[in-house]
Structures are given as C-alpha cells and as structure tokens.
Amino acid sequence: IDPMDGTLPFIRKEPGYSVSIALVAKDGSPQIGVVYDPVYDVLWQATRGQGVRRNGELWTLDASSQELTFTYDRSFVDRPERDRVLQTLEDYAHSIGLKKLVVTQFGGAVINACHALENSPGCHFKFSKPQEGGGSLWDYAATACLYEEAGAVVSDVHGDPLDLNRPDSTFMNHRGAVYATDQGLAERIREILAQSE
C-alpha cells in the first residue's frame, strides 16, 4: 500500500499524486492492482485474468494516437543522457509513423505509469542505479498489474519481470523499470537503457 505516491505534487497542490494498493504473490507476480487519482477522480483496477477497469468500466488499450507519450519523473531531468534519450525516442516515434513525441513530467511513479498507459502509445521508465532509492515495490506493484492485464509491457531494464517480492530490500533501483504500451516500444527503451549502463 502506498497511501500517497507523488508527495511533491501533493505538497505543491498539483496533479500527479495517487493512492496505490496491490497484492503480490510470493513469486513476485502482481495479482491485484488499484490506483486512485483524487485530482481527476479516476479509479484504475486490475485483477489477474480479469482485465482492467477504469471508473468501473472495462478498459482496453487504444493505440490510435499519432503521438508517442513519454512520462518522466524529476530524476530524469538531471540525467547526462537526457537529450540523447529524448532524441532517440523522437526518432523511434517517427520511424513507426507517429507525428511527434510528447514529453510530460506528470508526477509520482504511479500516475506517470497510468498516464503513459492511458495515452498509448506511451512509456515510462526508470534507469537502474547501484545506490538504494528511487522507488520501492509499492511504487510499481499496482501499475505492474494494470499493464499486464491491459496487454502492455512491464519489466526491469533487462526484460525480466519486476522483482516485486525482493527478500533483501523494498527498493527497485538495482534493476530499474520499463513500462510500455507495446513490445516494440519496450524493446527500444531497453536498448536506450542498455547504452546508459
């Protein structure tokens, strides 16, 4: 349970915070994911094998947009490879026939992932790093369930499932996170992240 993901947007009285609740199996697989965005009154729900609901209605990915959405958090702004990553994403968008890349700093990890899912094709990712910090399993568990049930892609930077039941730490920094609305986009993101390791 993360009763307040996106503390900074909340303190600033800006959109981008949420309540996030998940149930994770012993093997680390997300079973239930619930996210509530109180600013826009949106409730996302997913249960393994039962799809995704948005405000009580069954919801499916709509990849008809002509724009690629990339949501990022504060840590991305100071990354030395920021400009290269943005250019690579823009080039990828054009290569698959999209008109442009839309870049948004929206809020906490939970809302960033939801925003990318809702604005398909979209993505949100976190670089891996050796030092602890930068997100815990409760920042990723609910949205991992949403993505899996929507048929989208969620993984670590190497393409493996997120380590949501890590015995030695709640932090996810060691393997990063990739959220993408389709497999091709996820693969491109993993290539970008591999160049930064």
Functional labels for PLM-detected ranges:
Residues 1-53:
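DPxDG-like acidic metal-binding loop motif
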Residues 24-28, 39, 48-51, 57, ...:
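Short loop segments at secondary-structure junctions
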Residues 34, 58-62:
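A generic local secondary-structure boundary/capping motif
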Residues 40-44, 55-58, 162, 167:
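Short small/polar-residue motifs
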Residues 62-197:
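An extended, acidic
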